[in-house]
């Protein structure tokens, strides 16, 4: 069992493996009280006035306490991050890293701006961690790149992957969870999808071209990961019971 887990971990592409590792280490560290979530959450005042710049990064690494929901989120993160990196961004590690950087920037900007708008500022002030939103963004982008994969929800009904974000949003409403996390991820995902995929087809210009200094960070990355035969199988959502129809491949 341990060997299988180690092999699964080693086969992950570099960005997925790094993000998953950082998320697990951060959450475990908080659970063991080695570090405190109070030193990690997004706080604009502390960032600007006290130069606690690390909060711009650490708020994307903490997934709350370690419980069943945490395990679902880790599976969710590992699956869709891996699917994107191995397929849509196959051989383009720098572009994938830039996508995550862009998404994190958009999410942070939305929360900061929302916190300055009357009537909704209190809602945004309660958003302390954006890790789930960034994961949801990846799900949204994946669904846009794979809209025709057939999936099922708890065996109750089937749908195509294009509707996956909306199904997850509906599930959040059903169980009484805050929908803001999902909505922010959808907004960031759609902004990226429009600027990277739709706008270039309309105008011939690509506004999100990955900067050369980011490409230089991954200049030695020549590994192209082959797509696994069941890459489209299973959505593995927070409820852990969603799967794709293999006949749709």
Swiss-Prot record:
GO biological process: endoplasmic reticulum unfolded protein response; ERAD pathway
Gene Ontology cellular component list: endoplasmic reticulum membrane
Keywords on record: Endoplasmic reticulum, Membrane, Transmembrane, Transmembrane helix
Molecular function via GO: signal recognition particle binding
Lumenal face of the membrane: 43-96, 144-152
Chief location: endoplasmic reticulum
InterPro entries registered for this protein in UniProt: DER1, Rhomboid-like_sf
Transmembrane segments: 22-42, 97-117, 123-143, 153-173
Membrane topology of the entry: Multi-pass membrane protein
Cytoplasmic side: 1-21, 118-122, 174-249
Compartments where located: Endoplasmic reticulum membrane
Top-level division of the source organism's lineage: Eukaryota
Function noted in UniProt: May be involved in the degradation process of specific misfolded endoplasmic reticulum (ER) luminal proteins.
Similarity section: Belongs to the derlin family.
Protein name: Derlin-2
Native source species: Oryza sativa subsp. japonica
Lineage, highest ranks first: Eukaryota, Viridiplantae, Streptophyta, Embryophyta, Tracheophyta
Gene that this sequence comes from: DER2
């Amino acid at each position: 069992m341990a060997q299988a887990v180690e092999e699964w971990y080693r086969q992950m592409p570099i960005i997925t493996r790094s993000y998953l590792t950082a998320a697990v280490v951060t959450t475990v560290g908080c659970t063991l009280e080695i570090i405190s979530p109070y030193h990690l959450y997004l706080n604009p005042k502390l960032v600007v006035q006290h130069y606690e710049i690390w909060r711009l990064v650490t708020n994307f690494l903490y997934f709350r306490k370690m419980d069943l929901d945490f395990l679902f989120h880790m599976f969710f993160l590992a699956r869709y991050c891996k699917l994107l990196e191995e397929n849509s961004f196959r051989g383009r590690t720098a572009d994938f890293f830039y996508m995550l950087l862009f998404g994190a920037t958009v999410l942070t900007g939305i929360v900061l701006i929302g916190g300055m708008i009357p009537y909704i500022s209190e809602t945004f002030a309660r958003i302390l961690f954006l890790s789930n939103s960034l994961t949801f963004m990846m799900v949204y982008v994946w669904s846009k790149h794979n809209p025709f994969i057939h999936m099922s929800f708890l065996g109750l009904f089937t749908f195509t992957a294009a509707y996956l974000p909306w199904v997850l949003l509906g599930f959040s409403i059903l169980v009484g969870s805050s929908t803001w996390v999902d909505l922010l991820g959808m907004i960031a995902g759609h902004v990226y999808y429009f600027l990277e995929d739709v706008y270039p087809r309309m105008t011939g210009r690509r506004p999100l071209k990955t900067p050369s200094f980011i490409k230089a960070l991954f200049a030695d990355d020549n590994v192209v990961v082959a797509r696994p035969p069941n890459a489209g199988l299973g959505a593995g959502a927070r409820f852990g019971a969603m799967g794709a129809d293999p006949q749709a491949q």
